[in-house]
């Protein structure tokens, strides 16, 4: 069977667009921010296990607000606005809860010994500080005309690098989905 003119035309169109679709330059600060966000999301599995063991609720509004206020208070020393920081970390928290709720909606395997939530929170605090440090450089990379394609490419790359499953890939997208908007604030 010979290819039709239409199939050759489609192939040519894809080949011509391919380089344009791949032309987004690598954004190292953005990629680092997404890597940190991904690491933060992967801790949600342990948090969910801890909450399953303890019976604690996923929603912890007082702690969330405390964290948001503390991080927003550090915004100026990291070259970003307090509102930008609140938006970033509110999205991080929501993405983390998305993972927790999904994992808790099905029986979790027995972890054996109790999960140390304080150790996990300590790691989350460390990642939060690293996210805060990397936020201004990432926003600077996103203040371009092609922000959305650049962000999408970086998200796809992070999903591949970290071999994220569908749940964590969706959560990462949720955690970073509004970065282009936040860069303009």
From Swiss-Prot:
Residues 1-23 form the signal peptide. It is found in: Periplasm. One of its GO terms (cellular component) is periplasmic space. Pathway: Metabolic intermediate biosynthesis; prephenate biosynthesis; prephenate from chorismate: step 1/1. InterPro entries: Chorismate_II_sf, Chorismate_mutase-related, Chorismate_mutase_periplasmic, CM_dom_sf, CM_II_prokaryot. Keywords: Amino-acid biosynthesis, Aromatic amino acid biosynthesis, Isomerase, Periplasm, Phenylalanine biosynthesis, Signal. Substrate binds at residues 40, 51, 60, 64, 100. GO terms for biological process: chorismate metabolic process; L-phenylalanine biosynthetic process; salicylic acid biosynthetic process. Its EC number is 5.4.99.5. PANTHER family: CHORISMATE MUTASE (PTHR38041), SECRETED CHORISMATE MUTASE (PTHR38041:SF2). This is Monofunctional chorismate mutase. The lineage of its organism: Bacteria, Pseudomonadati, Pseudomonadota, Gammaproteobacteria, Pseudomonadales. The gene is aroQ.
């Amino acid at each position: 069977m010979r290819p039709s003119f239409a199939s050759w035309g489609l192939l040519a169109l894809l080949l011509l667009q391919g380089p344009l679709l791949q032309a987004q330059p690598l954004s190292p600060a953005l990629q680092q921010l997404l890597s940190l966000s991904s690491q933060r999301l992967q801790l949600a599995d342990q948090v969910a296990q801890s909450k399953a063991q303890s019976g604690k609720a996923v929603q912890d509004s007082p702690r969330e607000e405390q964290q948001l206020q503390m991080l927003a208070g550090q915004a100026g020393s990291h070259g970003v606005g307090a509102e930008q920081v609140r938006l970033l970390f509110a999205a991080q928290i929501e993405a983390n809860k998305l993972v927790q709720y999904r994992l808790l909606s099905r029986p979790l395997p027995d972890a054996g010994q109790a999960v140390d939530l304080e150790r996990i929170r300590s790691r989350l605090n460390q990642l939060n500080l690293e996210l805060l440090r990397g936020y201004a450089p990432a926003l600077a990379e996103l203040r371009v005309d092609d922000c959305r394609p650049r962000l999408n490419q970086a998200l796809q790359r992070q999903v591949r690098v970290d071999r994220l499953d569908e749940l964590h890939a969706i959560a990462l997208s949720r955690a970073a989905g509004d970065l282009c908007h936040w860069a303009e604030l």
